[in-house]
């Protein structure tokens, strides 16, 4: 155990004892548990990484790969689609960073398209990839990495299309509207595409997942049309059926790696039944953690509660006000980035957040997590708890129960809270209204061929037949025989059976995350898709 982790362990053990002995808070703690540390397990890659890349990793503290990282990279080398579901902070991103940088070091043609459901995740990954590439001696020509999303200025977009990077970072919304809808401008990228990264795969459930299934099918179809054959690399939170979910979402089987080789320090867990307001109890615990020198994150279930707790803290503990921030969707992107940077730099000691900080943006080393109410799923619970305890430090998670039945059940049955498996993920690729919209997009991008696209068309036969009946899709009939001596046709007739769409830009009719409504925000207005792509999903916003 490192010196830092020993110090943290002493601090956290002492804090738990102090809280239990506290005349006010002690009686409210109904259960405490300690989840012991896990040792690291390493594995070697054969053949090894390029020497310069291995040296860059070593300088960053990664002298050997953990076994799940090595297994993931090896699967990608074998051209296998791979799914990684190891815990938060287990280094999953190296599984997709290393193949791209190794290809760059070897001077190969392969390119990567890294898709993140939130813009902030893409910004975070670009910084990490660029730093690792520079440390390995790779320049922009060899290992360029660019972001192409709704915030990218028009002139910059044109420059990216003209000079394609090794890795293009985007999100599903921009892929749907800005890339697939204008795919002929991206032909060289699609032809050389070796890896498609699907980060935070568990977010693609429900109606968003139904849409994304079709966006991905359209992308893969266009890749095939120009000779591309990319491997899918997916990472996800732990789920009971992650492998089947990935197969349902993408239509392809995955090599599923769930066992982590990353070390994990011990974790303390407290379940709290407040004798009054859960918000007051959570605020008291927050202040105690900050006074103990612990970097702390509080997760609430609603934006209003986030701002309420932040307001109470500023009023009741003015000395702490400059050390704490709130974080939620509805903030402008730069406001959120400022909070993320301050947390990472250590200039903030605490943050009160909705689910917006649940996913893997790196905000540095946090020690304590306070859940104001059960988050609604074990998957979200462990995702949020996993935001603390990085960098070889022990951590503490406290759940302050709300008065509803499920929260109270877990307090009465704490082993259920500790042992309950994560939930199953559900996606419906066969959703017919969704399928109809994307069939129009696919046919507008590249006419559907009954032979080449047989599997896709058969899966959505009902939706296809309806669009043909309505005349929204058209199918080329056999060309009539030409009379002797007739002039050749001015235009080449369409191949028999080809299915095409005359509507221009049907992509604009589809919002992947909503219904196409417009939302008012502080600085103006944004369409539902753009607002959602720039915001943070979740019950609290």
Task: Put a short name on every predicted segment.
Residues 519, 526-541:
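Beta-strand/loop-dominated core regions that host nucleotide or nucleotide-derived cofactor-binding catalytic loops
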Residues 4-11:
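N-terminal, positively charged, Ser/Thr/Ala/Gly-biased leader segments
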């Amino acid at each position: 155990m490192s010196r830092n982790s020993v110090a943290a362990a002493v601090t956290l053990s002492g804090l738990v004892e102090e809280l239990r002995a506290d005349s006010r808070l002690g009686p409210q703690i109904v259960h405490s548990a300690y989840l012991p540390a896990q040792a690291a397990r390493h594995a070697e890659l054969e053949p090894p990484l390029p020497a310069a890349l291995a040296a860059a990793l070593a300088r960053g503290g990664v002298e050997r790969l953990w076994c799940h990282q090595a297994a993931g990279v090896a699967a990608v080398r074998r051209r296998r689609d791979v799914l990684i579901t190891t815990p938060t902070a287990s280094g999953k991103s190296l599984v997709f960073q290393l193949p791209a940088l190794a290809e760059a070091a070897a001077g190969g043609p392969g390119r990567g398209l890294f898709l993140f459901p939130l813009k902030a995740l893409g910004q975070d990954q670009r910084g990490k990839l660029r730093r690792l590439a520079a440390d390995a001696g790779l320049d922009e020509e060899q290992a360029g990495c660019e972001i192409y999303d709704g915030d990218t200025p028009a002139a910059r977009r044109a420059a990216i299309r003209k000079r394609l990077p090794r890795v293009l970072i985007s999100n599903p919304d921009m892929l749907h509207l800005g890339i697939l809808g204008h795919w002929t401008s991206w032909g060289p990228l699609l032809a050389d595409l070796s890896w498609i990264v699907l980060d935070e795969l568990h977010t693609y459930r429900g109606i968003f997942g139904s849409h994304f299934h079709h966006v991905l099918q359209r992308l893969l179809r266009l890749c095939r049309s120009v000779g591309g054959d990319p491997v899918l690399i997916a990472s996800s939170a732990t789920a009971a059926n992650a492998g089947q979910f990935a197969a349902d979402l993408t239509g392809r089987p995955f090599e599923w790696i769930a066992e982590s080789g990353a070390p994990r320090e011990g974790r303390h867990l407290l379940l709290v039944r407040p004798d009054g307001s859960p918000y007051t109890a959570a605020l008291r615990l927050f202040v105690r953690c900050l006074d103990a020198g612990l970097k702390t994150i509080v997760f609430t279930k609603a934006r209003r509660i986030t701002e309420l707790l932040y307001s109470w803290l500023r009023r009741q503990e003015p000395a702490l006000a400059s050390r704490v921030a709130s974080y939620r969707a509805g903030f402008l992107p730069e406001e959120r980035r400022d909070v993320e940077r301050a947390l990472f730099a250590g200039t903030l000691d605490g943050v009160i957040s909705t689910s917006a900080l649940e996913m893997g943006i790196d905000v540095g080393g946090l020690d304590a997590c306070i859940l104001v109410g059960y988050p609604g799923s074990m998957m979200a619970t462990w995702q949020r708890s996993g935001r603390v305890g990085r960098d070889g430090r022990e951590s503490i998670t406290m759940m302050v129960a709300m008065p509803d039945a499920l929260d109270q059940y877990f307090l009465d049955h704490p082993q259920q809270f500790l042992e309950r498996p994560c939930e199953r993920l559900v996606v419906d690729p066969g959703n017919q209204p969704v399928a109809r919209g994307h069939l129009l997009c696919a046919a507008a991008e590249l006419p559907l061929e009954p032979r080449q696209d047989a599997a896709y068309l058969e899966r959505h036969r009902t939706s296809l037949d309806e669009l043909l009946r309505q005349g929204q899709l058209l199918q080329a009939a056999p060309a009539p025989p030409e009379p002797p001596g007739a002039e050749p046709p001015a235009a080449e007739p369409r191949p028999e059976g080809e299915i095409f769409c005359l509507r221009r830009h049907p992509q604009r009719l589809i919002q992947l995350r909503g219904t196409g409504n417009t939302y008012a925000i502080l600085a103006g207005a944004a369409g539902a898709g753009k607002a959602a792509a720039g915001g943070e999903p979740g019950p609290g916003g």
